[in-house]
Every structure is written in C-alpha cells, then in structure tokens.
Amino acid sequence: DVYKRQKQMYEELWKYALDRAKNGACDMLVMDEFMAADRYGLIPHEEAIQFLKEKPEGLEVVLTGRDPSEDLIRIADYVSEIRKVKHPFDCGVYARRGIEY
C-alpha cells in the first residue's frame, strides 16, 4: 500500500529530524512541505506541536507548505504567504525533478 509506505518513510524522516534537532546537530531545521505531511497525517501532529513548543533554545525551525493548521499558526513566530506571480507551468513546463519535487 503506497500510503502505508509513505507514512513509514515520513515517520522515519520525522524521527531523524527530531533526533538531529534535540542533540544539537543543527542551529536551523528546515522541513520543506511540512504542512502537507501534517495535513495528510504522515507525521504525528500532536508530537509536532509538542516539539515546536519545547524545541531546544537557539534552534530556528522553518516549516514550509500551504494551509497550515490553526494551532501551527498560533505557536509560530512568523507566518508568511507566498503567491505565484509567474511559474514555468504556465508555459507548459511540468514538474521537474530536483526543482518542484
């Protein structure tokens, strides 16, 4: 089952990211498309909220993606919206490996 494999992969990545963040291996943790993983239940939402509330001092966390949950917005220091003005897709260029995915 594709969803089950994806969920397992995301959970492994989530655990890896938490471990790196908690052991001081990084000053900044960037999790691209985090909002989609959260929205589709690919990572444990309550665990993510707890981590963000208790993250190590000095650690900057950047979460990207569309439609963040209200509780993520509430605990965030910054929330930005980015809108597309122009994109190669508009000219028929489809998603490219290493760029859009």
State what each model feature region is.
Residues 46-58, 71:
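Catalytic-core regions built around general acid/base machinery
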Residues 32-34:
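Walker B catalytic acidic pair
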Residues 36-47, 72-73:
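Conserved ATPase-coupling elements of RecA-like P-loop NTPase cores
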